[in-house]
UniProtKB/Swiss-Prot annotation:
This is Small ribosomal subunit protein uS2. Residues 251-270 are annotated as: Disordered. One of its GO terms (cellular component) is cytosolic small ribosomal subunit. Pfam families: 40S_SA_C (PF16122), Ribosomal_S2 (PF00318). Keywords: Cytoplasm, Developmental protein, Nucleus, Ribonucleoprotein, Ribosomal protein. The keyword Nucleus applies. The keyword Ribosomal protein applies.
């Protein structure tokens, strides 16, 4: 698929990421249509995927995505919780439409319901859990790209990307690699420059583990310093209320000392 071009070949850094994320580890069961992607079978029964074919199918999927003129017509779907964050991040950087969580039945076939959509391409995380949108896409002739494990059914799937779709790190890495390849083909980022978006942003995080990490981080913080209270001397002040009362009492005249005279008579008699 790389056409002999070294710039399109799988780099050692990407191979290391795949091995660390266990992308090459399949399941113990193998679908007969997935046998072509199996490299070897270990002694414990786990099948090993061929990462070279994984990279070729990922490039093919990226070219199919870039061929769509309007990116919002591409729907990226994940019913499994481990792929929902990766789907949202992929949609953010590639301007596609995400469906993270439960898929509404009839969204592609029932034109009466408000949630009816007409996508031109689907990208799903797991054919087993996302079987409903894949089935509806087959009714209306929508091509489907899927991340498939060794035991995944390939019915109604046009482009299968073999990988470990049961691991949170593996599925996050595959969505990250697909997003990077799409942006490279669009010319948004250069192949000679490393994409600044780290792959950790695509990994699923358990809410309980995140709370535990936050609690542990708070415990490591130093305790706030408490300043000791200092007693400051209080200046003696005079009671201003007593002074005002004394001045008021001393300055008031006795109103009853003078005889009240009227103007009705000269000697004050009626």
């Amino acid at each position: 698929m790389s056409g002999g071009l070294d710039i399109l070949s799988l780099k050692e850094d990407d191979i290391t990421k795949m091995l660390v994320a266990t992308t090459h580890l399949g399941s113990e069961n193998v679908n007969f249509q997935m046998e072509q992607y199996v490299y070897k079978r270990r002694a414990d029964g786990v099948n090993i995927l061929n990462l070279g074919k994984t990279w070729e199918k990922l490039q093919l999927a990226a070219r199919a995505i870039v061929a769509i003129d309007n990116p919002s017509d591409i729907f990226v779907i994940s019913s499994r919780p481990i792929g929902q964050r990766a789907v949202l991040k992929f949609a953010k950087y590639t301007d596609t439409t995400p469906i993270a969580g439960r898929f509404t039945p009839g969204a592609f076939t029932n034109q009466i319901q408000p949630a009816f959509r007409e996508p031109r391409l689907l990208v799903v995380t797991d054919p087993n859990t996302d079987h409903q949108p894949i089935m509806e896409a087959s009714y209306v002739n929508i091509p489907v790209i899927a991340f498939t494990n060794t035991d995944s059914p390939l019915r109604y799937i046009d482009i299968a990307i073999p990988c470990n779709n049961k691991s949170a790190h593996s599925i996050g890495l595959m969505w990250w690699l697909l997003a990077r390849e799409v942006l490279r083909l669009r010319g948004t980022i250069s192949r000679s420059v490393e994409w600044p978006v780290v792959v950790d942003l695509f990994f699923y995080r358990d809410p309980e583990e995140a709370e535990k990490e936050e609690a542990a981080a708070k415990e490591l913080l130093p305790a706030p310093k408490i300043e000791e209270a200092v007693d400051h001397p209080v200046e003696e002040t005079t009671n201003w209320a007593d002074e005002v009362a004394a001045e008021t009492v001393g300055g008031v005249e006795d109103w009853n000392e003078d005889t009240v005279k009227t103007s009705w008579g000269s000697d004050g008699q009626f």
